[in-house]
């Protein structure tokens, strides 16, 4: 069944709080936040606000010097990883505003989506700071999303589910788009993230890694947002979660693992100490299993986390003053984990 975009002005609505729906509701479009149906959305909104940060807070002075000292392979990996992150946050900012939020009919969730779109724009600004501070290949990095055929192939696949929703906004396609967002936020960023942390573990590009830590913390809240929307929909519209749809979702995850593992191998070229092809593949498989289990779908791969040190590098729950000396003061800001929701 085709779903209509919500009205931006709807004074005739008599929808009560308990009648609110993830999509297909009849909201007034007023943000009456004294009445909340999805309490997790209110909690998440406050966490996102507490996590506010700005790219200029992160010093990139040492990174410019470090970049010049990177090996040719390390520079290629840095540029490729950054180019992919730039594309995904650009895509996601537009996707949320133009393609997802218009169909979501819960005001408390609308707020979270608008905040997420702001954060995707903030990430785009952070990447611009990184590119301008470090790389001599500014235009090359910004054009790589369509000029590098390996990257373009990945981007084409990522975008196709969103484009299908824009073309054919059925209930099933909305649900598939929510899963696609979960995959983007929970899988497609992580080869790039782990690459920056691997450099930082060797004492290189510490400012870049700190920027990525802030970005990843935001992405965790985005992942939780879509997982909670999926789980709420499972309660509201169990009829949509057919065996056929679940099988399609599992295939989406399998394809994502294949694409992201291949991308990670392309970034590292088999020449980055600490990130072998097999480690990257197992890491992405582990992430896929984790994401599937969070939305009530059985794990596919049954593998262990192969690079647990990445978690300590990305965590804001520990003061790593010897690693990120410039930003110890920010560790008091909001942190988030799956256990919070």
Swiss-Prot record:
**UniProt-recorded Gene Ontology molecular function terms:** metal ion binding; ribonucleoside-diphosphate reductase activity, thioredoxin disulfide as acceptor
State the active site. Answer: 127
Q: Is the Metal-binding keyword given for this protein?
A: yes
Instruction: Work out whether the entry's keyword set contains Endoplasmic reticulum.
Output: no
Q: Which InterPro entries match?
A: Ferritin-like_SF, RNR-like, RNR_small, RNR_small_AS, RNR_small_fam
Biological process, per Gene Ontology: deoxyribonucleotide biosynthetic process
Q: What is its EC number?
A: 1.17.4.1
What reaction is this protein's catalytic activity? Answer: a 2'-deoxyribonucleoside 5'-diphosphate + [thioredoxin]-disulfide + H2O = a ribonucleoside 5'-diphosphate + [thioredoxin]-dithiol
How does the record describe its quaternary structure?
Tetramer of two alpha and two beta subunits.
What is the role of this chain? Answer: Provides the precursors necessary for DNA synthesis. Catalyzes the biosynthesis of deoxyribonucleotides from the corresponding ribonucleotides.
Name of this chain's protein: Ribonucleoside-diphosphate reductase subunit beta
Recorded source organism is Helicobacter pylori (strain J99 / ATCC 700824) (Campylobacter pylori J99)
Gene designation: nrdB
């Amino acid at each position: 069944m085709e779903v209509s975009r919500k009205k931006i002005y709807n004074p005739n609505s008599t929808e009560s709080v308990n009648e609110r729906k993830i999509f297909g509701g009849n909201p007034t479009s007023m943000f009456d936040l004294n009445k909340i149906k999805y309490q997790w959305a209110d909690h998440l909104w406050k966490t996102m606000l507490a996590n506010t940060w700005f790219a200029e807070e992160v010093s990139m002075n040492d990174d410019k010097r470090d970049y010049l000292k990177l090996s040719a392979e390390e520079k290629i990996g840095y540029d490729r990883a950054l180019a992919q992150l730039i594309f995904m946050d650009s895509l996601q900012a537009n996707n949320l505003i133009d393609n997802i939020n218009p169909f979501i009919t819960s005001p408390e969730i609308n707020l979270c989506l608008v905040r997420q779109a702001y954060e995707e724009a903030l990430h785009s600004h952070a990447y611009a700071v990184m590119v301008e501070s470090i790389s001599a290949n500014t235009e090359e990095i910004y054009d790589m999303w369509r000029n590098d055929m390996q990257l373009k192939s990945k981007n084409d696949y990522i975008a196709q589910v969103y484009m299908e929703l824009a073309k054919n906004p059925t209930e099933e396609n909305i649900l598939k788009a929510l899963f696609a967002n979960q995959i983007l936020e929970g899988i497609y960023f992580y080869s790039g993230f782990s690459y920056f942390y691997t450099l930082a573990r060797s004492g290189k590009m510490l400012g870049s890694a700190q920027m990525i830590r802030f970005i990843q913390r935001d992405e965790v809240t985005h992942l939780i947002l879509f997982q909670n929307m999926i789980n709420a929909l499972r309660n509201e519209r169990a009829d949509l979660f057919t065996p056929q749809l679940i099988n399609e979702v599992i295939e989406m995850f399998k394809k994502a693992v294949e694409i992201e593992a291949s991308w990670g191998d392309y970034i590292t070229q088999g020449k980055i100490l600490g990130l072998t092809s097999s480690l990257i593949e197992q890491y992405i498989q582990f992430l896929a299993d984790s994401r599937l289990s969070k939305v009530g779908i059985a794990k596919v791969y049954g593998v262990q986390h192969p690079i647990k040190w990445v978690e300590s590098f990305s965590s804001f729950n520990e003061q790593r003053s010897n690693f990120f000396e410039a930003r110890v003061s920010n560790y008091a800001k909001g942190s988030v984990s799956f256990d919070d929701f």
